[in-house]
Structure formats: structure tokens, C-alpha cells
């Protein structure tokens, strides 16, 4: 299955000129397909997604400056459930994302890197191979950056130079035990896949449209409602349908969760 479902690497840097963040504050706008979008008072629209082997929901957040990383920092042995982090941050919605220490099912510490409001709260980019940063810079543009092999000092310099505001890490790894991947769409170019690109699993992904709106997608799988889950191909198709210029996988499996109050 792994050999039948692979993907080519994506090395292009994001072209920020393709994103022009809208200053429109209306709760009703027209999307890329000419359809009227109705946002709630928080500037959020929820969409239900149905695929061949998954069901999902997407949050479309009109103002990308409202999307931030929430964590349990300062780090400890035990983490929190997503709804606790969302409520603690005074937010109305959230999804999971990024790598964390899963041994013992305690989830108190991240893996790789974490940036919150411009501050690096976890800095170990060389602890795992194949790491990517997924986050937003201070201009509220989605960033998907290969940080494989960076030292902690290199990463600190990169965060300062690139103006990274909030970010987590996920991993590119194709093996018998893992089928992890990160870039899905870069500069309107979809990742080239062999087969479906990956197996089917619950997934969490992020994208950004040309108008700056953020797309947060979570799908089910692993037998939930009889669904196997979403493949890399599925994620790309959904993100393209909803106008993503750039998109990346954030996490998957039993961690995939969405909260929306």
C-alpha cells in the first residue's frame, strides 16, 4: 500500500504576492465560485464536507489575524483536551495540530518547534527528521517551511528574519509505521501524487485562500460512522475546491479534533 501511494517532494517557497488579504468586514461575501458566503458574527463560516470514505467539517476564518496557536505552555507531563485549550484562550473555535510526545497518552510536551505570538516556546528542530514548520507570519500569511536539519540557533534566526508569529511542526515520513506528509498545495500547485498519495486516516489540515481567509479542515476515519478516512488526494481536492492557494497537513489519526462554540 505504501509503495502504491507516494508523493513527490515540494521544495518551492511560498510566493506571498499571491495572497491579498481582504479588508472587507461584511459578514456576507462572494467566494471564488461566485457563491455567497455567510459568516457568523465572529467572521467564521462552517462547511460540511462529504468524501468517498470520510466526513469532515471546514472552518473558513475570514480574518487570518484571528488564527493563533494555543498550547498548554509552560510544558508539563500532562496536556489538555482541545476544548480546554480553546476555552482557556477565550477562543470560539480550534483544531489540533503539530507533533507531541504521545507515550503514556499524556500529551504534555510538543515535539519539534512551537512559536506563540512571536515567542519560541519550544525549540528542538533537529530532534526528528523531515520536520516542517506550519504557521503564520506577522503579515498573517500562511508559511510552510522545511526546517529539517536546522539547529536551535538556526531556527531562532529564521523565526526572527521571517517574522513568524505562530507555528507548530509536523513531519514528512514514509515508512512501515508512519505515513506523514505536510505540503499539499504551494502557490496554487498541487503536490504530485502516486495513487492516493497516502492511506486513509482522520486528518487535520490548514489552507489559505487568495483573499487571506484561513481554511481549517478536520475529517473522521478509522471506522467512525463506517469511514476509513481521508487520503492526501482527498485533502488536496477539498482544499482546491475551497480556493486554497497554499495548504498543508497538520496532523491526523485519533488526535484529529475540531471545537466550535
State where each predicted segment sits.
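Domain-core and long-helix interface of multi-subunit machines
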Residues: 169-170, 174-241
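Active-site-adjacent helix-turn-beta-strand microarchitecture at beta-sheet edges
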Residues: 101-196
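Solvent-exposed loop/turn segments at secondary-structure junctions
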Residues: 65-66, 99-103, 141, 212, ...
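Short, solvent-exposed aromatic-acidic interface loops
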Residues: 72-78, 148-152, 219-223
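Short acidic-glycine loop/turn motifs at beta-strand connectors
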Residues: 62-65, 135-141, 186-187, 208-212, ...
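Short, conserved catalytic/metal-binding motifs centered on acidic residues
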Residues: 94, 206, 251
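Exported/periplasmic cell-wall-interacting domains
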Residues: 228-230, 236-261
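Zymogen propeptides
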Residues: 1-145
Amino acid at each position: 500500500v505504501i509503495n502504491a501511494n507516494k508523493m513527490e517532494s515540494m521544495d518551492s517557497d511560498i510566493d506571498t504576492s499571491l495572497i491579498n488579504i481582504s479588508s472587507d468586514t461584511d459578514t456576507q461575501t462572494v467566494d471564488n465560485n461566485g457563491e455567497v458566503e455567510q459568516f457568523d458574527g465572529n467572521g467564521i463560516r462552517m462547511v460540511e464536507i462529504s468524501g468517498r470514505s470520510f466526513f469532515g467539517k471546514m472552518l473558513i476564518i475570514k480574518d487570518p489575524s484571528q488564527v493563533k496557536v494555543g498550547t498548554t505552555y509552560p510544558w508539563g507531563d500532562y496536556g489538555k483536551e482541545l476544548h480546554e485549550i480553546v476555552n482557556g484562550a477565550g477562543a470560539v473555535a480550534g483544531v489540533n495540530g503539530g507533533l507531541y510526545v504521545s507515550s503514556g497518552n499524556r500529551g504534555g510536551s510538543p515535539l519539534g518547534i512551537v512559536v506563540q505570538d512571536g515567542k519560541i516556546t519550544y525549540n528542538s528542530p533537529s530532534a526528528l527528521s523531515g520536520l516542517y514548520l506550519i504557521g503564520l507570519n506577522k503579515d498573517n500569511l500562511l508559511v510552510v517551511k522545511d526546517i529539517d536539519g536546522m539547529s536551535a540557533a538556526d531556527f531562532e534566526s529564521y523565526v526572527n528574519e521571517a517574522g513568524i508569529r505562530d507555528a507548530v511542526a509536523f513531519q514528512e515520513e514514509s515508512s512501515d509505521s508512519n505515513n506523514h506528509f505536510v505540503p499539499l498545495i504551494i502557490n496554487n500547485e498541487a503536490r504530485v501524487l502516486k495513487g492516493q498519495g497516502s492511506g486513509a486516516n482522520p486528518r487535520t489540515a490548514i489552507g489559505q485562500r487568495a483573499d487571506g481567509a484561513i481554511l481549517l479542515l478536520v475529517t473522521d476515519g478509522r471506522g467512525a460512522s463506517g469511514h476509513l478516512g481521508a487520503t492526501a488526494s482527498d485533502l488536496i481536492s477539498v482544499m482546491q475546491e475551497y480556493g486554497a492557494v497554499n495548504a498543508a497537513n497538520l496532523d491526523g489519526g485519533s488526535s484529529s479534533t475540531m471545537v466550535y462554540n
